[in-house]
């Protein structure tokens, strides 16, 4: 994964002839840096505890690597000898309450790349050129698609997808750095401008190596782990059979797929790596079930019955039915 970070940094520095600021901050951050200083509205759904891992009222595990940018920008604003053109490189693990499938994990690796320049303005054409450089560097020969998107900390934003066969796969987002984000850090937006980009490193590495299961990136099996040291195509170790289990559970009305995924991870602890995916097959409100059925499930009147399909598969061995049960 570090090879991707290095390749992207070198490609952009060669193109822009700018200086570099590397950030590798601690994952516990202030809510202000993760949300407020990036212009997230106080009522943003992203702030809800079902999506964010709070440590206390004002502290949290960062939900994106963009949380490193406010402090990076403040440091730039305080530096009397700051360079006129700087690429901020901020990789790291992020922490989310997310659904479980072959492309998602609750602790994804991300990378923020922000170009901050004093003097000449930066426009959407500059942003488009940045996207092209990034995609050509990490996924040579792969076509990308830009879709208008809104992000609190940018203007004129895009979502970045790449074409994989007949489908699109999202790899990141970008935009022009929001003037208020710059101003809040002590950088006068009349004198400074920026290009902001956030990328999913796990997703990029999977696409580069031809990996279809995100758990392989963290596999302990030496046959798998040894292949994560370079960018050559992945050679499958073996194909293990999946085991499916359907669970009928009582939950509060409106419990999201992300909540269910987080509960599965918490319940299984170290065995959570065996879960390939979870999917809600059906939702039935208590009012639609007989009293006998509600009693059997232990379903209260203000709850709903969820039929949850859990697919278990180890990346390096065959699971026994006893283990799965």
What do these predicted regions represent?
Residues 1-104, 116, 168, 173-182, ...:
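Class II aminoacyl-tRNA synthetase-like tRNA-binding/catalytic domains
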Residues 3-15, 126-139, 259-266:
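Amphipathic alpha-helical segments
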Residues 12-19, 81-82, 135-143, 267-278:
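Short secondary-structure junctions
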Residues 18-33, 144-151, 276-280:
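Long, charged, glycine-rich C-terminal linkers/tails
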Residues 122-158:
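Extended C-terminal subregions enriched in glycine
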Residues 150-325:
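A carboxyl-terminal module marker
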């Amino acid at each position: 994964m570090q090879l991707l970070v290095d390749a992207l940094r070198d490609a952009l520095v060669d193109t822009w002839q700018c200086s570099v600021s590397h950030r590798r901050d601690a994952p516990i951050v202030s809510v202000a840096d993760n949300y407020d200083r990036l212009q997230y509205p106080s009522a943003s759904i992203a702030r809800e505890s079902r999506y964010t891992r709070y440590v206390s009222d004002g502290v949290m595990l960062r939900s994106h690597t963009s949380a490193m940018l406010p402090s990076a920008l403040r440091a730039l604003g305080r530096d009397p000898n700051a360079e006129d053109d700087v690429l901020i490189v901020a990789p790291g693990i992020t922490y989310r309450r997310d659904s479980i499938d072959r492309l998602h994990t609750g602790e994804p690796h991300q990378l923020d790349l922000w170009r901050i320049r004093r003097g000449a303005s930066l426009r959407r054409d500059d942003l488009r050129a940045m996207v092209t450089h990034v995609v050509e560097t990490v996924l040579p020969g792969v076509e990308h698609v830009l879709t208008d998107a809104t992000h609190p900390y940018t203007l004129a934003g895009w979502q970045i997808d790449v074409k994989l066969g007949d489908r699109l796969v999202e790899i990141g987002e970008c935009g022009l750095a929001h003037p208020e984000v710059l101003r809040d850090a002590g950088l006068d937006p009349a004198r400074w401008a920026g290009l902001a980009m956030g990328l999913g490193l796990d997703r990029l590495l999977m696409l580069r190596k031809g990996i279809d299961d995100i758990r392989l990136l963290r596999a302990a099996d030496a046959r798998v782990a040894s292949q994560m040291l370079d960018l050559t195509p992945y050679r499958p170790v073996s194909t293990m059979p999946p085991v499916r289990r359907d669970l009928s559970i009582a939950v509060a009305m409106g419990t999201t797929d992300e909540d269910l995924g987080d509960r599965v991870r918490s319940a299984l602890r170290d065995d959570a790596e065996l879960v390939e995916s979870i999917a809600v097959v059906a939702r039935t409100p208590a009012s639609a079930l007989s009293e006998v059925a509600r009693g059997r499930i232990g379903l209260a009147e203000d709850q709903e019955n969820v039929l949850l399909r859990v697919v278990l598969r180890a990346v390096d061995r065959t699971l026994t039915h006893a283990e799965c049960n």
